[in-house]
């Protein structure tokens, strides 16, 4: 039996909480190894950090998002490293557990968790 239920308008993300400062500092400590130019703009440094983490972990769809913890009232936006979402193309290309474990090791983080994302970010 094929049941097609309407997709929820909520976009969920599997990811790890981070901070802008952590990402900027990560670039500073890995700049030479990846031949990254010195840059004072935090937006560029955050993207450089994502690029380095993608290379190190093999998680090509790794990105930053603002997420909401499920059950967090009032809902506060938290910066996260998004590993994959519940969107079909993202979920289909989700990373292996070994890749996620490597990312956790780099971040010194616990298990990734589910976050709610703002659907307007995907329009």
Q: Which role fits each region the language model picked out?
A:
Residues 1-109, 121-123:
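Acidic (Asp/Glu-rich) sequence patches and key acidic residues
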Residues 113-120:
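Intrinsically disordered, low-complexity basic segments at termini and long loops, enriched
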């Amino acid at each position: 039996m094929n049941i097609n239920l309407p997709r929820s308008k909520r976009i969920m993300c599997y990811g790890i909480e981070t901070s802008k400062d952590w990402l900027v500092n990560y670039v500073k400590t890995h700049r030479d190894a990846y031949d990254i130019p010195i840059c004072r703009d935090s937006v560029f440094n955050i993207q450089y950090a994502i690029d380095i983490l993608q290379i190190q972990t093999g998680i090509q769809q790794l990105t930053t998002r603002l997420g909401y913890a499920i059950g967090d009232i009032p809902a506060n936006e938290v910066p996260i490293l998004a590993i994959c979402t519940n969107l079909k193309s993202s979920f289909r290309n989700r990373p292996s557990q070994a890749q996620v474990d490597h990312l956790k090791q780099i971040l010194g983080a616990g298990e990734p968790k589910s976050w709610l994302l703002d659907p307007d970010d995907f329009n």
